[in-house]
Amino acid sequence: MTDLKLAAQRALNLMDLTTLNDDDTDQKVVDLCRKAKSPAGLTAAVCIYPRFIPIARKTLREIGAADVRIATVTNFPHGNDDIEIAVAETRAAVAYGADEVDVVFPYRAFMAGNEQVGFDLVKACKEACGDKALLKVIIETGELKEEALIRRASEICIDAGADFIKTSTGKVPVNATPEAARIMMEVIKAKNPKVGFKPAGGVKDAAVAGQYLAMAEEILGKEWVSARTFRFGASSLLASLLATLGHGDKPANTSGY
């Protein structure tokens, strides 16, 4: 298997296959779940809005893909600083059956100088997840922009108990970048290598995915790169990976996540 095909296969098995669109419907989520059981194997998870968790669970079970985890989003996409609402949404997501919750860090409050609300929100949402769901925290690196802010936000999230730190919502102009990824993974290495990393948005093909995988291996080691600690958040990536692996045609360039 070529290096590119190897990267494509690994990326597929590490993917949180995502639909987070305003026009999502039950049928679109059913279709997404069916895609998660691909000709080249299962994706790690699907990532959907909370209201679709029951239909996703039912569909994955029916198609023999119950091992695909269900991730959802809370405090999304704006990262407000109302802890009570973020916790209520997270608790509801877990009650609905989410295996993983991707919560948005209150990055604007943080940029305005309030570190405490971010720490408190992540800590409270982690408590709401208990031992039932992983907590993945989106720090919105494309808005933070500065290395020092990306580094500090990553540190706060890890200190507050995040299971993963994630670059982006996919709802702002700049999503995952290699520069932000390096900073975040360096913080993980320094503070707690059990914490996972998820680049989201902007990972368009096997070559780009391979760059992130190589960087993760360089910083944290080959053994670290598994679905337990590394995911790609993506929607259009899957078709490109399947084409690289010989399943279907390469898609036209698509924008967005």
UniProtKB/Swiss-Prot annotation:
Pfam families: DeoC (PF01791). One of its GO terms (cellular component) is cytoplasm. Its EC number is 4.1.2.4. Keywords: Cytoplasm, Lyase, Schiff base. The active site is at 102 (proton donor/acceptor), 166 (schiff-base intermediate with acetaldehyde), 198 (proton donor/acceptor). Gene3D superfamilies: Aldolase class I (3.20.20.70). It is found in: Cytoplasm. Its main location: cytoplasm. It catalyses: 2-deoxy-D-ribose 5-phosphate = D-glyceraldehyde 3-phosphate + acetaldehyde. The keyword Lyase applies. The keyword Lipid biosynthesis does not apply. One of its GO terms (molecular function) is deoxyribose-phosphate aldolase activity. Pathway: Carbohydrate degradation; 2-deoxy-D-ribose 1-phosphate degradation; D-glyceraldehyde 3-phosphate and acetaldehyde from 2-deoxy-alpha-D-ribose 1-phosphate: step 2/2. One of its GO terms (biological process) is deoxyribonucleotide catabolic process. NCBIfam families: deoC (TIGR00126). Catalyzes a reversible aldol reaction between acetaldehyde and D-glyceraldehyde 3-phosphate to generate 2-deoxy-D-ribose 5-phosphate. Belongs to the DeoC/FbaB aldolase family. DeoC type 2 subfamily. This is Deoxyribose-phosphate aldolase. It comes from Aeromonas salmonicida (strain A449). The gene is deoC.
